[in-house]
Amino acid sequence: MKYNVMFFGTPEIAKIVLETLFNMPEVNLIGVVSQPDSHFDRKKNVVYSPVKQFCLDHDIKLFQPQKIKEIEEEIRSLAPDIIITCAFGQFINQGIIDIPKYKIVNVHASLLPKLRGGAPIHYAILNGDLQTGITLMHTIKKMDAGNILFQRSLAINEQTTTKILTLELANLGALMIKEHFLELVKSDLVGIQQDENDVSFAYNIQKNQNIIDFNKPAFFVNRFVNAMYDKPIAIMEYNDVLIKVHQIKITNQKSTQKPGTIAISKHQIFVSTQDFNVELLLIQLPNKKPLAPKALLNGKNPFSN
């Protein structure tokens, strides 16, 4: 038996879940809803989201409303049996929540009730959590507060970046949808209520929240850079130049200078923190490609002033 399925999502993590649904024999993918185009390249050409590009490549019916409520009647006319969502980026109104027979199931990238919100992967790393995971949950009007249906965890280490963890969680979420789909399309699936006493939040990273604070200990600075990679990427300011910091390494050198002080040794760049120096391994000047310090220091750069 095939089930009529709609999918709501936008970024790469959502595309991987969508691709799995598209290839499942029990799924009839009747439509996808994604955020409106909002990214442009240097030539001001529109850059399609991963989900939109997948839909265009596979001739899938796509909706991009400014607000999801605008297409409520179109969704109703498609009569989805179930709606799957992942990193969609809009609140879903009650009218749409009530449409599918088997409800809306959200693929959320945390072990709920921890880290409700739009940036759970960033904050799992920022918080120094030892594990995170995927929660399949029923969507209700309150953000990420619906009943937990299935959960599975993944380990996090000090080298884990948001880019790496996003891919791992995307693959895990896709696998869980594949394994549990026939259970999700059962009317008697209720799940477990979330414990409101254990709730924490992971709101979207805002502008200027990606600036490195070298007054923090080195372990936190390293964690921060990992959490911001590869979006939005951590930044530091030096000689009035904003520098993107892609990768650093904690050294065993005790910091003897004021936090944020730069020291250059041959082809290496070090920055002092609250306790230990960190070494910049991959950095990027404005409108340039990311470079290792050895290559960057050979040319014109803010560190030679």
Swiss-Prot record:
EC assignment: 2.1.2.9
UniProtKB keywords: Protein biosynthesis, Transferase
A cellular component annotation (GO) from this entry: cytosol
Domain of life of the native organism: Bacteria
Protein biosynthesis is among the record's keywords: yes
Binding site for (6S)-5,6,7,8-tetrahydrofolate: S110, L111, L112, P113
Record's catalysed reaction(s): L-methionyl-tRNA(fMet) + (6R)-10-formyltetrahydrofolate = N-formyl-L-methionyl-tRNA(fMet) + (6S)-5,6,7,8-tetrahydrofolate + H(+)
GO MF entry, a single one: methionyl-tRNA formyltransferase activity
Keyword Iron: no
Function: Attaches a formyl group to the free amino group of methionyl-tRNA(fMet). The formyl group appears to play a dual role in the initiator identity of N-formylmethionyl-tRNA by promoting its recognition by IF2 and preventing the misappropriation of this tRNA by the elongation apparatus.
Family per similarity comment: Belongs to the Fmt family.
Protein name (Swiss-Prot/TrEMBL): Methionyl-tRNA formyltransferase
